[in-house]
């Protein structure tokens, strides 16, 4: 510090030395410690002097320095250099206030002892370096030293705040310490309580185990008293058993107290016995397994002591192996499976049922009882596996296989055998056989006998039939006071409609059938489900083809006919002509002396409608229609469709019994539970009696129109019948697609059909009956060259799956009274699939017919032009042979087809390459003129040959 003057009293620190402060009132000395083996160590010891204060003086606060882990040995080396600085710092800290009274005590020798006083010297002045030590306790004022600087008011306030914060922290730490001590006391009390509870439970468990062991011991003693022979045998076995392991036999000629060997070394020639768990003997009643012979954590000292005692000649006690404990039913039922208990068990034991069966078998063998053979009635279907047959006979499949092996047949349990073989096996094993067929699942569903005493009158079912546009639906609308015709596309009926009206307090059920030729199947179904047929014939149109067809359907169904001559209000009406025309088809009306009722009506002007209804009621009274309403319902499906909001909806006609919501029914190959019944006016009804048409909701799928339905007992029966019918439908479809094979004629027909062009279609309609009519109409359009192939058809809207199917099969999509959803439209637009919508069957058939006509190969039509005779043949360079000809008949055109005829035999057919007259190309050469001709790719021409010219035209065909 040579660059400072004597008057400069500022604090200066050499950067090469560490700033230290000498602790006032502390003396340092060195003590040498002696250790063993001549080692010594010098230890620095600090001695702190006690400061005494006068009574009139205020005690000064000693700033408690934080304990530092640094070794104090470095203090004497730096003390001389920093002595003035320490003295100056001590005097500078003298004027600070002392708010807390703290008696000065001698500092402990160990610097690492915990200090509970607050750390006052944490707030350092701004001019101090971070490397400097904290402020030391101030010296008295009478001591000499260098005063570096007095503390400012802000520094004094900072120190005061630090002291206050330290006091607050000390109070908080004391509170936390009290809470921690309280928490520890509570935790200790809880643990002590848990230990006591655990000890109590363990004592109870040990007492229970001892009681159970004592009870088992007494039971074994009583059993041993009742069975003396097994005990004697066990005693004999115990006598013949060798000495216990670990007990050394007494050798001859050697005293018992021979020289012992060292305790830590085993005896020569004998293995050291393994320790046995001492606690297991009184509890367990069985010899312990090898995995339990050593207790975990047990030391080997016991083994050494036992081996040492044996070597010293002390008689070792024989180890008693406790009998194995068999867990009873109670132990097996309760308790949980753990890893320890699983490892301690010997393995998987028999079940309780197996033990019970074993005991019963043992008792029967002791009592010399033979088990009687139980004869069962075995139901055998058309095919059955050996395993299933064994289960039905309650026999082992191994016994059946052995029997078949004796018969020379090697079979497995999964092999399928026929009903005859199964019957032979069952009879051989002493059982009776009941043969059933797969179709027996439908037995007892339809045609169940009615209870004659419960029969009541039912409304008649009337079907309105006739030719298209003869006014069938208009007549029914006039009767129902409704307007259905306006809702039908094109004014023609394309569905079967079922309605119920009331006349003179009596109900009449009407079924309206389509009159178009495409709906033949619908008319046939309508005739089958009816009691009376009303044949509607227009007075101005007389008998037409569909009228004749309706007559045939009614006669085939055996139902009476009532002729309704409609449109009598027209000027051209001639009812007498209608009656005369009906005579040709064996329909004899009353006006002509027959028995068939005829009524002249006008649906438009509602003339004689009451007479028609009276005739219906009269005919129904003659038929004496009755039904049993208390039996399960049967009927027929009139129409079915897939409704977007309601699912599968079927219009059915109840023929027998009463249908209720919740009934489980089977309709064709579909089944379901009736969720709702809706009548023809859209009202929900609680039940539907005989001859009542209703819509049913809840079927799993859409049945076919015309299918019969019946109510079954449960879902299992319904599912079984539906699966059987679906299987039959698949088999029929496969047989129809595969085609018949056999005769040569059938094979040739198949080859001919395979060359037929196909027009693939995907048809979606609103109801199943309309789809059926469309398919039948398209089948009639087919010829030997082209036909329509229905890739898929179904009731419901057009979906994405339909578009994907059409894209895969390159088919067009036809929607009849349905539309495609947005996803299907977008998909069809992306893939280029055409979707066409129709609501009139006429338009649909016409468009498909035109499209199929485009697939027909055009007709080749040939027109004769003329003949020419070859007069001379010329060889021209770069051209070839050219024929000089004279046209003898007709004309010859350039580019026309030609035939080369030699000796009345056609030897070439081709086209003209050139046609010249006097070296000029001409379009045609008339008769009588000469010309030059050359053929394409042909040169074998001679003088005298005849050339025939013709024109070929291709004309498109239609179906």
Swiss-Prot record:
Region of interest (G4), residue spans: 566-569
Annotated stretches, region: G5: 602-604
GO molecular function: GTP binding; GTPase activity; guanosine tetraphosphate binding; translation initiation factor activity
Sequence positions that bind GTP: 466-473, 512-516, 566-569
Low complexity biased stretches: 63-118, 128-138, 246-284
GO CC terms in record: cytosol
tr-type G domain location: 457-626
Function description: One of the essential components for the initiation of protein synthesis. Protects formylmethionyl-tRNA from spontaneous hydrolysis and promotes its binding to the 30S ribosomal subunits. Also involved in the hydrolysis of GTP during the formation of the 70S ribosomal complex.
Name of the protein: Translation initiation factor IF-2
Gene designation per UniProt: infB
């Amino acid at each position: 510090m040579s660059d400072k003057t004597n008057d400069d009293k500022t604090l200066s620190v050499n950067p090469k030395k560490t700033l230290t402060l000498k602790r006032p009132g502390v003396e340092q000395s060195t003590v040498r410690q002696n250790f063993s083996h001549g080692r010594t160590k010098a230890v620095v010891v600090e001695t702190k002097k006690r400061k005494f204060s006068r009574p009139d003086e205020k005690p000064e606060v000693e700033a408690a320095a934080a304990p530092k882990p640094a070794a104090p040995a470095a203090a004497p080396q730096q003390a001389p250099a920093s002595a003035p600085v320490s003295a100056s710092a001590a005097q500078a800290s003298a004027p600070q206030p002392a708010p807390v009274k703290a008696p000065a005590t001698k500092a402990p020798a160990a610097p690492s002892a915990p200090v509970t006083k607050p750390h006052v010297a944490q707030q350092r002045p701004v001019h101090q370096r971070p490397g400097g030590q904290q402020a030391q306790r101030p010296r008295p004022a009478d001591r000499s030293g260098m005063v570096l600087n007095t503390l400012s008011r802000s520094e004094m306030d900072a120190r005061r705040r630090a002291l206050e914060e330290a006091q607050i922290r000390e109070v908080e730490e004391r509170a936390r310490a009290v809470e921690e001590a309280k928490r520890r006391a509570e935790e200790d009390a809880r643990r002590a309580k848990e230990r006591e509870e655990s000890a109590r439970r363990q004592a109870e468990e040990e007492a229970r185990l001892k009681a159970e062991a004592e009870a088992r011991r007494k039971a074994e003693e009583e059993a041993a008293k009742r069975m003396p022979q097994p005990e004697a045998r066990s005693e004999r076995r115990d006598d013949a058993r060798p000495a216990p392991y670990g007990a050394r036999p007494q050798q001859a000629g050697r005293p018992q107290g021979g020289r012992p060997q060292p305790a830590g070394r085993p005896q020569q020639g004998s293995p050291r016995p393994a320790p046995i768990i001492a606690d297991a003997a009184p509890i367990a009643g069985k010899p312990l397994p090898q995995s339990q012979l050593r207790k975990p954590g047990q030391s080997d000292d016991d083994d050494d002591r036992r081996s040492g005692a044996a070597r010293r000649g002390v008689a070792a006690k024989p180890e008693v192996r406790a009998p194995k404990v068999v867990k009873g039913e109670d132990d097996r039922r309760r308790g949980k499976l753990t890893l320890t208990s699983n490892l301690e068990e010997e393995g998987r034991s028999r079940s309780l049922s197996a033990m019970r069966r074993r005991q019963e078998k043992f008792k029967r063998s002791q009592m010399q009882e033979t088990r009687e053979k139980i004869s069962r009635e075995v139901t055998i279907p058309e095919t059955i596996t050996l395993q299933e047959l064994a289960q039905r006979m309650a026999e082992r499949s191994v016994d059946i296989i052995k029997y078949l092996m004796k018969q020379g047949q090697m079979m497995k349990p999964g092999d399928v055998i026929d009903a005859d073989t199964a019957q032979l096996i069952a009879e051989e094993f002493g059982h009776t056989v009941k043969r059933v067929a797969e179709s027996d699942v439908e037995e007892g569903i339809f045609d169940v006998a009615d209870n004659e005493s419960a029969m009541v009158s039912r409304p008649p079912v009337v079907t309105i039939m006739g030719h298209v546009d003869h006014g069938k639906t208009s007549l029914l609308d006039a009767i129902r006071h409704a307007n259905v015709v306006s809702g039908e596309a094109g004014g023609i009926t394309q569905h079967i409609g079922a309605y119920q009206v009331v006349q003179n307090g009596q109900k009449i059920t009407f079924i309206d059938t389509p009159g178009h030729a495409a709906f033949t199947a619908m008319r046939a179904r309508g005739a089958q489900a009816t009691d009376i047929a009303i044949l509607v014939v227009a007075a101005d149109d007389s008998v037409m083809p569909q009228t004749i067809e309706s007559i045939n359907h009614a006669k085939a169904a055996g139902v009476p006919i009532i002729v309704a001559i409609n449109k009598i209000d027209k000027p051209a009406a001639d009812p007498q002509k209608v009656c005369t025309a009906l005579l040709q088809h064996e329909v004899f009306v009353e006006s002509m002396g027959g028995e068939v009722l005829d009524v002249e009506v006008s649906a438009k002007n509602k003339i004689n409608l009451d007479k028609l209804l009276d005739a219906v009621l009269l005919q129904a009274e003659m038929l004496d229609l009755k039904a049993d309403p208390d039996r399960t319902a049967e009927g027929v499906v009139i129409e079915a469709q897939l409704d977007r909001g309601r699912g599968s909806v079927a219009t059915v006609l109840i023929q027998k019994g009463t249908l209720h919501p919740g009934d489980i029914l089977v309709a064709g190959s579909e089944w379901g539970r009736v969720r709702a019944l809706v009548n023809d006016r859209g009202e929900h009804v609680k039940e539907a009696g005989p001859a009542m048409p209703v819509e049913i909701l809840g079927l799993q799928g859409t049945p076919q129109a015309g299918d019969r339905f019946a109510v079954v007992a449960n879902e299992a029966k319904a599912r079984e019948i539906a699966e059987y019918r679906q299987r039959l439908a698949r088999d029929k479809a496969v047989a129809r697609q595969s085609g018949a094979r056999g005769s040569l004629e059938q094979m040739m027909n198949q080859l001919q059909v395979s060359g037929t062009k196909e027009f693939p279609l995907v048809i979606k309609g609103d109801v199943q009956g309309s789809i059926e009519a469309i398919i039948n109409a398209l089948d009639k359009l087919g010829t030997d060259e082209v036909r329509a192939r229905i890739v898929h058809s179904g009731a419901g809207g057009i979906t994405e799956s339909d578009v994907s199917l059409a894209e895969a099969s390159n088919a067009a999509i036809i929607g009849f009274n349905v539309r495609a959803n947005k996803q299907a439209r977008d998909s069809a637009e992306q893939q280029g699939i055409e979707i066409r919508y129709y609501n009139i069957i006429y338009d649909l058939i016409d468009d498909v017919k035109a499209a199929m006509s485009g697939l027909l190969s055009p007709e080749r039509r040939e027109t004769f032009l003329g003949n020419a005779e070859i007069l001379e043949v010329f060889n021209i360079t770069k051209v070839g042979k050219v024929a000089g000809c004279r046209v003898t008949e007709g004309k010859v055109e350039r580019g026309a087809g030609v035939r080369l005829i030699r000796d009345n035999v056609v030897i070439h057919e081709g086209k003209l390459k050139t046609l010249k007259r006097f070296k000029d190309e001409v379009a045609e050469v008339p008769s009588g003129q000469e010309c030059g001709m050359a053929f394409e790719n042909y040169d074998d021409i001679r003088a005298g040959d005849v050339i025939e010219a013709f024109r070929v035209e291709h004309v498109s065909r239609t179906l």
